[in-house]
């Protein structure tokens, strides 16, 4: 029975749509899927129904299944149906109809009619409330659409859909994580499973819904991947859902189930029974082809998850039949071919084992599966073991042969191990399967033992089974009995194979071999030839071959002595190559047996052995005997190569002919293979013997198929056979039929034959004569073009050792232009003609031309690959071919680009080979104009590059050949090639330059070489901006290096600077920087002399731009000035010059990038040259000379600047315009001067310091321009900053000059300032290493400048004095009066003034005093107060700097003087300044001094410190800061005072403390009379409280000094004479801490206790609420301190009770109760005896009128008392 809650919930659900009031009805009616609530509220049911009915009819037209709802949900009567008044049955029917409709509408929510139709159900039947679950389930897969969001806004969420709560009436759609949370609920999964069952049953599933379901379940599995328990709970549910989906006829449902099962099995491996059941379910209803593949993949994945024992056992028979019916064998093969990405070995192992167990008809086909799948080793072992067991019972064992051959081919050892595990051997198993299988044999085995084993096994098997009498066996197979005296070597393979199988079967059944042979072969000839064929048959088991040898030996004994058995020897010799040692050993015995017989001319079966009436030439008996005897004596069983024994060196021609004939006529493929291998392996084999095989070679290709069939049937390796056949073609072959055979094999349609012969050619080709070589090469080329070859003709061709003559011959035979290109009279290039074009348009000729192009391509590829040793004829032929390709390109329009590129490579290789062999040579027959024309006409940059390389290579071999084409080539390169951004193009240009330019320079035919060079530079520099940025340095450095750096750097620099100028004028700043970066990197490729020389020559070129120089005839005539410079105006020339100099300046100067790239740092290069001891002195002098020239040219340019003038405008302007023009000229000249000064600075910075000083001293000492001297002085300062200390002598030289400058009265302020700054920099760097006389002189001059009244000079002088004091120390004492007073005066002068240099001045003064403090501290004491004042008031100086100076003061100045000075400074300056920073710095200094002072000094200076301390206490009354700032200052003072007190002993501190008490209470020693007593008391008590916290019980007794005053103060608080809450709080805190830290029973003294207790407790009468808690703590602490003294307890109790009486004030009683509660909570046991007196008081208070008092007593005091007594307090009240 359901609970009451459930019943109520059901009632609420049923009445959810019952609305008794209008507002609720309106709200229910306004819930709409389409309209907003306001619109929906105004609509009636008729309107809604009409709209919905129209949409419903649209749905019916789309899907007729909706028609069923015509008479129910969408009937006309539905308008009047009210769900709330329906019966249960009617409601049930309505719900069923709605649910059916929702399941059917699910895939159509994206359609507008679906929304409008469903709108009716929502508005009329409230399905969003009563059918909410089905509505949500049917739309769940639409969770990311607006429709679902609308549904969430109106639906009443069922409990299981709680994860959607946050998305109700929200703009956001549910997330994927929300769906995972939803599906992670087991109850919801069950609900969804039921829903799936319904839609599957109703057949209303659809793809998107199934895809959504699948994804959700996969996400849930993935979400719980690490929770095995949860996965185990999911398994039954997912299996149930999968079963329902699989039961559906829909392929989509089935594939959804497949996916879920596969994912589940991957996440949680299932046991085998579940997987078998799942497999059965999957296969039970598998009908659609779409689902079949997915089903197989799923089954494979399920099986792949199996682990442990039995995971690859055969399938149950029922499952196997289902698999076989669902997946035909061919389907499985196709699946394995296409789906290699899936691991399915376990399923297919189980399937194969099932085939072995149940379905033997498919045994022969399982090899196809095995070849397509990779199995684990253990799986292979299971299958092999099953097959071995099957071989015992299977009738037709031939079905197993292919399978075992496959397993043996991949792992023969494993098969043998499986046999051994079952007590079987390989030989026995071969007998069982009636075939030869194994190739790996034990070398120690013996034939006798093998035979015994075979016979024993056969007998055992016969005994176990029902033995068939031999007579019956013979009768059954009587059709195969041979009665003719025939050679069994000639019998058809089918018959032989059958006889072989019968022989094996007979042996395996235990029949005697002799009985079988004598019964089935009635003649001796047939018996012997049969066993002979078995011996050399690869398909016969080893045991059978041994038996056959034994039988042959017996048969030989039965032949008469007159018959010569040497005719059997050739076949037996081939048996000596058997893999089995036992076979070889027994064969040797048979040969020995034959050797013992007489040799006669009567050969056994001489005319019928190899064919009817086929007479094979034989050896004479004598030769036969000789050969066999020697052979057996030399043969060893272990031998693997017996070719030298077969063809002995003596009488080798006879034996070669004999064995060649034997090889020719042998009908057995295996024996023929062995014999041919033996013959072709001996060195005697030559073309004379290959004639024997002429007919065989002529017919082989046509008969190849029959030979292949023979090999297959006899298990002979056909590839080995064909290799032996191809080897018939002998080295040094001369026979044309053999060459034809070779060519025919290459051109045959058989891939194996072609490849074998192609490999054979590689070894034969070098031994052939030239005509045959040419014939083979030409045939390969022709066949490669004419037909599709079975081998790689091009690879074969490229593998042959072809010579240049071969290529020349081939090229000549394949040429188009017949005219002689080498004829010197025909210098003009052939032009493409209309005749050629029209001819090549014809189809047949066009095809010929295409074939010709293909041939040429093959030839060129081969030549390019081989790189043969070349000659001039080959080069001529290649040039002719270049002309041919142009013809095909221009006239025929054929795609010759690849051929041209390959030809270019061939030309390069050929020229390189000629150069390495012959060096320089003349090639008059070569046409360079062909190359130039090809370069120009080609549209391919790569082709152009390669041809340029050819030009360069040709120039290195024969310069005259290309000399006349130099300019066109370079013009083309400048316009095209150097613009390509690839490594190859760059390499081409560099190589072309490096080859052609030297030829140009060496040539005697070229005049005006400088013009040519400048034209060349202009061609390349014009294309600079188009050259890829990272290619420029390499390209242009190569060009300049080849042209000659000493002559070319300057013109090239000039051209680049001109482009730099153009960029600046066009405001392309970023691009202009690229030129500077480029040229720095460019110059790094040359040595320093070349760089300096280039700069000097560039100055010469720049000078030509001046106005006067422009009239010079040199400038216009130079090629360098032809690109627009000659036509420039004067103003344009001036701008160009200015920008050129700026370019030089930036190239020479250092930048940030030079820090990381030392190679482009000019300064570093000069230094390394001058300082390197390995460089010769002469070179260093040359560097200095070049630098001198550079410096002189720079200075000359500066001197010439003033004389420059130009007119920007026409002279016909007004005076105003002229004035403006002159102003612009002055600005430009100033800019030019600045550039030149910067250049001068950078030039001077290039040299080492010694050379630098030597260069500038004359300039500084002479009458040089002031601006020049100014810049030189600044450069000097910077120069010395990074110099090592060893340069002090050089520094003395420059310092002397600078000191002299400061002495000159005529010098300007600017010069004096920069000079003083430089002196300071030098002194700072070198210190006392400098000449002391110069330093003193500098001091004197600085003191003079200190009084100059010019702030710039004052700052610089102070800086110099600071460094000098730092350096000289005490030696500067004589200048003290000239420095310190003046500095103090200067500070005061500018202290309140506004000046931009004020900060620098204050900093300079502070640093001056800092250096004095450090170096001469004792002499500064007289002005220490002034120093402190300056330090505290240098507002412009950073606080960190001033704090550092404070540290110096504390460290170097005696602390007693520091304290005294601090006291004076505070009194006289800081206290009255209202400067918070000054106060902060003062306290910082005081703190540092207190921390640094030792105890002895602290004792001595204690009076001074405490006077200062009292002054600091008084600061409160005079400062204007806010209260927080004052409190922070006092907190710092208290902290400093406590640190100081810790360094004093009691003897010293006690009188000082008394002094402070007198100051506080009596006003003794007060300096500020305006300070009130209360302010003093507050300051004192703060100090005392802080000290009490630090010293604790040490100063408890000190309270004696303030006991009476404190008592009086407490009384004043009671009497309200003093009303100061803060002061009262401080007093109470002081008493509390004193009581708390009393360790010497100080307060247990009755006199003190009685004195203080009354005053303290009486504070209850009027204590302020804000400090009441402090009074409670004080009283509690006093009670705790005196808890052991009963008298004191009684006194306190009486006093406390007196404040708790009813007559007392309310707050008085309240705080008294609080105090009593604290007392009892702390010392309750001691006060228990006093409780009776307290009980009446408590009783009265419990009935107090004030609720707060009554509550405090009841909940506070009473509870504490009860806890102390351990019993209820009520009993005392009763």
Swiss-Prot record:
Repeat as UniProt keyword: yes
Recorded superkingdom: Eukaryota
Alphabetical keyword list: Nucleus, Repeat, Ribonucleoprotein, Ribosome biogenesis, rRNA processing
GO biological process: maturation of SSU-rRNA from tricistronic rRNA transcript (SSU-rRNA, 5.8S rRNA, LSU-rRNA); positive regulation of transcription by RNA polymerase I
Protein location: Nucleus, Nucleolus
Protein name as catalogued: U3 small nucleolar RNA-associated protein 10
Gene Ontology, cellular component aspect: 90S preribosome; small-subunit processome; t-UTP complex
Transmembrane segments: none
Family classification: Belongs to the HEATR1/UTP10 family.
InterPro entries associated with the record: ARM-type_fold (IPR016024), BP28_C_dom (IPR012954), HEAT_type_2 (IPR021133), HEAT_Utp10/HEAT1 (IPR056473), U3snoRNP10_N (IPR022125), UTP10 (IPR040191)
Species for this entry: Kluyveromyces lactis (strain ATCC 8585 / CBS 2359 / DSM 70799 / NBRC 1267 / NRRL Y-1140 / WM37)
Pfam families reported in the protein's UniProt record: BP28CT, HEAT_HEATR1, U3snoRNP10
Keyword hit for rRNA processing: yes
Ranges of biased composition (kind: Acidic residues): 1215-1226
Region (Disordered) location: 1206-1226
